[in-house]
UniProtKB/Swiss-Prot annotation:
This is Phosphoglucosamine mutase. It comes from Aromatoleum aromaticum (strain DSM 19018 / LMG 30748 / EbN1) (Azoarcus sp. (strain EbN1)). The gene is glmM. Belongs to the phosphohexose mutase family. Mg(2+) binds at residues 107, 246, 248, 250. One of its GO terms (cellular component) is cytosol.
Length: 450
């Protein structure tokens, strides 16, 4: 069965377009309620319950109400967490023994986008097959439950406080953050009232950024996708380092005291090297976009490295397949399965800091053996219906580039899971060669797509 509505991270789009409307989201909630609840064996008279969390977008209120109506029509109780990070929904769903969790967020996208993604009772993303089953039911008629079986809604008391304590518990008890000055950029997003509390309660002096959401400013020149704001604040405040989350708090990048940026690949390496030194690791999962330098540095640690498809759900699937506990993406999604069931920006940052304290080192020294290959990524818009995979000009351009790079580089062409774009990535030892080849392939795609 093909995927009609779900992309790589749930259902996502522009608010008011075909899928991000109150009507569609109500139908989606109903379909998810019927699908997920049908798999649960509950005691007689007990209704299933699903948690809903959201980020700070103004459209979240509208979509939350629509989801609530859909679940209630399916006979499902709803527990409302309010604005909390995506990983908080995963944690609370599991901790409260609920049947599923739902996040209303478009992650790092601007405020006028939004989306819906689901978590299982175990706090993991739903498998493709289950999402496809929900899609099928979305297009079927809604049959409202009898009045006596309709679901009810209530708010969770101190959902944010419970998650703060969970994050703190992921940091070693023998350490604290006293003496550290940390700039924390919460992207005016879901972690705005949570992130500062976590690091402050662990002892750090916290300089907060992006903690004044107004419904329209999420990810606007702040957060993990705009690290220049974090860098400027770190340098201006002479901080030890800075941490930037994205709008829903599931990804992280960091900046050291000198203003150097550390993306997901670098942070993943810091955690891997520390855990390997303790004999706690067998392998690391990256993605097709992970830098070759990371793969080879992980190999020098004596660890295996596997590449998953892009998307934290696929990283997690590969981790489970291989029985490994650590994986991540260069975008900043890092999954530490000994700490959480999903990617968590705050928890991942704490694992990096713990590694630095254990190794008595800085981010720069922790990454001294990690040499990145120059990488060029170009996003090329695609015309509707264009089949780039069967175009001979594009195939020839890719083959020529791969032949020229040999074993010292690679070429990756990957369609976006959320936008009509083809991502052209070239990587190799020679930066000018990489730039030239990437631009040539991108030009071929543009001309072929016209």
């Amino acid at each position: 069965m093909g995927r009609k509505y779900f992309g790589t991270d749930g259902v996502r789009g522009r608010v008011g377009d075909s899928t991000i409307t109150p009507e569609f989201v109500m139908r989606l909630g109903y379909a998810a309620g019927v699908t997920l609840v049908g798999r649960e064996q509950l005691p007689p008279g007990e209704r299933p319950a699903i948690l809903i969390g959201k980020d700070t977008r103004i459209s979240g209120y509208m979509l939350e109400a629509a989801l609530e109506a859909g679940f209630a029509a399916a006979g499902v109780d709803v527990m409302l967490a309010g604005p909390v990070p995506t990983p908080a929904v995963a944690y609370l769903t599991r901790a409260l023994r609920l049947q599923a969790g739902v996040v209303i967020s478009a992650s790092h996208n601007p405020y006028d986008d939004n989306g819906i993604k689901f978590f299982s009772a175990n706090g993991t993303k739903l498998p493709d097959a289950l999402e496809e089953e929900i899609e099928f039911r979305v297009d079927q008629p809604m049959v409202c439950a009898e009045a006596s079986r309709l679901g009810k809604a209530r708010r969770i008391v101190d959902a944010a406080g419970r998650y703060v304590e969970f994050c703190k518990s992921a940091f070693p008890n023998e350490f604290d953050l006293r003496g550290y000055r940390i700039v924390l950029d919460c992207a005016h997003g879901a972690a705005y009232h949570i992130g500062p509390s976590v690091f402050h309660e662990l002892g750090a002096e916290v300089i907060p950024l992006g903690v004044e959401p107004n419904g329209l400013n999420i990810n606007d020149q702040v957060g993990a996708t705009h690290p220049q704001t974090l860098r400027s604040a770190v340098l201006a405040n002479k901080a030890d380092f800075g941490i930037a989350l994205d709008g829903d708090g599931d990804r992280v990048v960091m900046v050291d005291g000198d203003g150097e940026l550390y993306d997901g690949d670098k942070l993943l390496y810091v955690i891997a090297a520390s855990r390997q030194a303790e004999g706690r690791l067998e392998g690391v999962v990256g993605t097709l976009m992970s830098n070759l330098g990371l793969e080879r540095a992980i190999g020098r640690l004596g660890l295996a490295f596997a590449r998953a498809k892009v998307g934290d759900r696929y990283v997690l699937e590969t981790m489970h397949e291989r029985g490994w506990r650590l994986g991540g993406e260069n975008s900043g999604h890092i999954i530490c399965l000994d700490r959480h069931t999903t990617g968590d920006g705050i928890v991942s940052a704490l694992q990096v800091i713990a590694a630095l304290i254990k190794g008595q080192c800085t981010l720069a020294t922790a990454c001294a053996d990690l040499v990145f290959y120059p990488q060029k990524l170009i996003n090329v818009p695609l015309a509707a219906g264009f089949d780039w995979r069967s175009d001979e000009r594009i195939d020839q351009a890719r083959s020529d580039a791969e032949l020229e790079l040999g074993e010292q580089g690679r070429v990756l062409l990957r369609p976006s899971g959320t936008e009509p774009l083809l991502r052209v990535m070239v990587e190799g030892k020679d930066g000018s060669q990489v730039e030239r080849l990437a631009r040539h392939i991108a030009d071929c795609v543009r001309h072929a797509s016209v």
